[in-house]
């Protein structure tokens, strides 16, 4: 069994020994030039609409994961404004963490019912084998990012009625927010 990629196509050969060629082409409509303010307004409106779509008409208790960073703070702010009830927010980190500090500032400003989950380095490392089993990955970056999410999800499931959990994931990928993206070529 193998997969081989060619220019504009790929070939699959599976156990049946049949070869299938798939050709993919993309066409993009030319968009009119807009002012920077129009682009920013479009991002703002679509961002709010994406959160609204997940919050409006939601019958279940909502909570937000709040790191204190820009992405989760913006999402939490929108959820808080759209929600009919005071929302819960949760943060997780090591004692003295900057994330916990800034998450508390945002939570206080928004008036959320905020919970800080403070973990030790030992607890973090102890849980890695369990997380690897659950996420079915040994990828270092994935595991590192998943341990905190796993622990905060476990805490919420045991200590909260929240059934819908919203976070800021995806914004960095969409907007090129990771530090290593700054070294990427301009064409990205």
Describe each PLM feature range:
Residues 1-34:
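N-terminal segments that mediate ammonia production and transfer
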Residues 26-188:
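ATP-dependent adenylate-handling active sites, centered on carboxylate activation for C-N bond formation
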